[in-house]
Amino acid sequence: MDKFIAAVVAEEEHKHQIEESYEASGEVDDAGRDDMDDGDDYNSRNLIGEGLKEPIQIRFVDKFDTIEEGIDGGGVTKEFLTSITNEAFSASNGLEALFIENDQHLLYPNPAALEERKATLQQALIKEHSQTWNESTRDLLRRYEFLGRIIGKCLYEGILVDIHFAPFFLLKWALTGGSGSGTKESGYRANLNDLRDLDEGLYQGLLQLKNYSGNVEDFSLNFAVTDTIRTSPTTTNQITRELRPGGSDMPVTNENRLVYISFMARYRLQQQPYHQTNAFLRGLGMIISTSWLSMFNQSELQTLVGGSSTEISVEDLRSNTQYGGLYTIGDDGMEHPSVSLFWKVMQSLDDADRKKVLKFVTSTPRAPLLGFGNLNPRFSIRDSGSDQTRLPSTSTCVNLLKLPVYRDEKVLRERLLYSVNAGAGFNLS
């Protein structure tokens, strides 16, 4: 599968190069580190569409409005994209979380996001379908579209992000533009099994209803569903939707319970999140061809997004590492003693800490799909002085670990893990 994926990506890039025969200067964006998810900053980036296929140059601006030093050799762009995804796909973003997670911490579009936005507007006495109302709801959907483009950009550039999507949501990607679906529309059809990835409690309840041997009218169900919609951190509204016309007056019986289960699955998985999902898929399709997405199943798409879930191979990483400065390997082919200590420490770490080290250096915790030989630029190590109290540092733009000339394995391990767990940002110093 890996070689096939690589071939498809190469073909997509070649196709784009042919289509874009003119010379592009590339998009330049100044990004505030502390305002990655700020409304105005977010909206300005919503204007970026097909242009995201072009190289973009990012300059980080600190809280003093000072542009950070450093040339974007790919690493700054990579940090920019991963920072956006870390913020925007967080399930703890308060009242208007765009994505929420299930019990397995897998993400999918917040089904209630649009209803919550409308309820908030109603509470503010904004007239329905007024210019303010329409612009506010469109703004929400533009955010979903923007995130679709960001994920598409990550896929297009081969940038892995530490995000895990729910399988039913990934299946919608795979079926976008497929047989029986319209342009930019998913051919996905809801089923009871997919509900398990959305709401385990609802899935179990409907399963019990399906297999109930008594009279299901004892549950007093009808063909309607009531949701609690947040209008502020402390207030909520109750909204009832009929699953079919006249559903509020239609009881669920032994005879129609399978129809009820089907309608409930369709409402929760398709109808309620319809606009949010389609906006995301529209943005994704601006960067990645829908025919390309349809080649992969859910598991393969997740691998493309987040990388291989297998353990980090120290041997593979070591054999594909470049060295500089004092650590340059000479004609004798021997590693510097400090480098040998580093690899000894890496071998002793568990997989979780190995991934932390990898993220510290490359900004992503997973290996490329085809192994570290396909990491671009290569993982590299160079010396950074002989002070034993100095901590390792990195330049993520070139996947470079700056490793002091440590002489003791214990010291190296302690200093490395301290740096890794400190959560340092991009820094060229």
Regions found by a protein language model. Give the residues of each.
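Hydrophobic, conserved cores of late-appearing folded domains
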Residues: 1-170, 174-194
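C-terminal catalytic/scaffold cores in eukaryotic proteins
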Residues: 36, 169-429
